[in-house]
Each structure stands twice: as C-alpha cells, then as structure tokens.
C-alpha cells in the first residue's frame, strides 16, 4: 500500500421525502480494515493520476470579496487537537449540505474524508462519491441488482496538502481539486463549501514553461536532434514529477538539462519575461506538445511526433499544406480499400 491511513469516515447526504437534503452522520471512524485500505489506496492512485487538476488555497473570492472560513477553521481546530476527527467531519458534512441546498441539481452522495500520509506529506482527502447500480450472479445463478461506490469516476474531490499548508501559509497551491467536465463551474459548490479559491493557473504556467523551452532551444547552438532531445528531457522530467505528485522545480529542471550538456536554462527562464513561478504543478496535456503536434478541425485529426517535422512530415505555411512521407500501414490499407471501392 502506498499510503498510511490515519483516519477515515463516510457520511451520507441525501434527499428526504420532501426533497430536502439531510445528513446521516456516522458516529465513529471507519475501521482500518482491508476494505478501507484498498478503497483509499485506489482513490489515492486514481486522484494522483488525474490530469488537469486545479490548485488553490483557503482565501477570499476576488469577485465578491466573500470568505467562507468555516471549513478551514474547523480543520485548524482538528489539527490543534481541539476537535475530534468525527466531530470535524460532521461539521464539514453540515457545511456541504448547506452549500448543496443552494442548488437545484444536487442529489447528494456519500462524503468521504480521510487523513493519510504519502511519502513525507500529510493529506486530507475529501470526496463526494456517488453510488452506481450493477448486476451480480448469486450462488443459485439468479441475477441480483446492487449498488456500489463509483470509485473510478470521481468528479467531486479535493486534497489538502496539510504539510505544505502548515509550513507555508502564503502558498497558493496546497489544495488540489478535480475540475468538472465542463470546467470549474461544475464543481464550484464543492470548492465553496471548503472556502477554496483557485490560486495557480497550472495550464498557463506549463504553457509558459513550454514557450521558454522553445525560445531556449531556438537561441542555442544545438543541432536539430539535440533540440528535440532537450524537449524530450523536459517532458520526461515533468512527467516523472506528475507521476510522483510533486511540483516542477525550475532550478531542478535546469540542473537536469545541464547534466545533458544544456547549460544556463535557469538563468534564461528567470531572466526573461516569462513570469514563471519557482515551483508549480505539472500538466501533462500541455507539456505533451513538446513531443507531439496534434490538431483537429474540419473533420480532420492529425497527430505526429515532433521529431518527424521536416523529415517524414513537411509543413509548407505558404501553401497551407502538410506532406506526409511514409503513410502509416493501417491508414494506407484503409485508403487503398476505399480507392478500390470507388
């Protein structure tokens, strides 16, 4: 198991017969048995590998100047030993119920809260889970319908890095959260109940890093192959940091490049007008552009490795055309079949 569980509990928020949301609070923590360990380890892995997460902190919303410190205050009391975990989680459930009641679309769910340690950091994981119907076969070979927690499709979840929060009160990224499929607006109520404000634009920071890398290789004396090796090294480093749940560190990245004979990236990135933070979370989908070109439009989707540009893939901006040398075998087969059928 990759985590050490300290506390875990589940409360239910559901609608009564009048359509009003009600809390059903569990009176004691979950026992740290195999089922709990397997569930939380799976959720930890699933959450950590989620791409496109947002990052924020306990703060005041810029638009209306409103603050909702109740969750942060309760968490502070729990960390100070003034509140028990059950009492703290119960207060959190009530806060979420009050926030959910403001919206017509909410059906409630199961609020899971867990404190655990992974590597050297303490975390508080908060998720609103839903139940999913499934079928099973009984011993007498009859079908039976049952409900189970949908752990593979978590959409409303956040994780607070308690170690970072305690060590650096000025940090703006100790809370991570899953963005809704239609953007952050889907999960606004979930962040509002915790008093979380988005603090770091992860995609923008990663895009800026990518631009800095491109400018760096363009201004260097590196050969074409060496430039692509530099891009690949940056992507590999950032991917490793993402998989570890760690931030990209510009100084650390520059040292990695220096080991490959590509000196002075740190001075280049910090000396320009890139406005890069010293540390920020990785976003694989953005940085993947260092290795691949891809685009969709007008019914055409195209994707290829960056190393093929100028060799197998020739782009002519004047005629607005792309020439592909060596059509992939499976695509060639489809095209040949279609031509024969015309």
Swiss-Prot record:
Give UniProt keywords alphabetically.
Answer: Cytoplasm
Q: Which Pfam families match?
A: NA37
Which GO cellular component terms, listed alphabetically, does the Swiss-Prot or TrEMBL entry include?
bacterial nucleoid; cytoplasm
Keyword Cytoplasm belongs to the record: yes
Question: Superkingdom of this entry's organism?
Answer: Bacteria
Where located? Cytoplasm, Nucleoid
Gene Ontology molecular function: any one: double-stranded DNA binding
Q: Where would one find coiled-coil regions in this protein? A: none
Q: Does the keyword Cytoplasm apply?
A: yes
Q: What family is it from? A: Belongs to the YejK family.
Q: What is this protein called?
A: Nucleoid-associated protein Sputw3181_1720
Origin species, per record, is Shewanella sp. (strain W3-18-1)
Show the taxonomic lineage.
Bacteria, Pseudomonadati, Pseudomonadota, Gammaproteobacteria, Alteromonadales
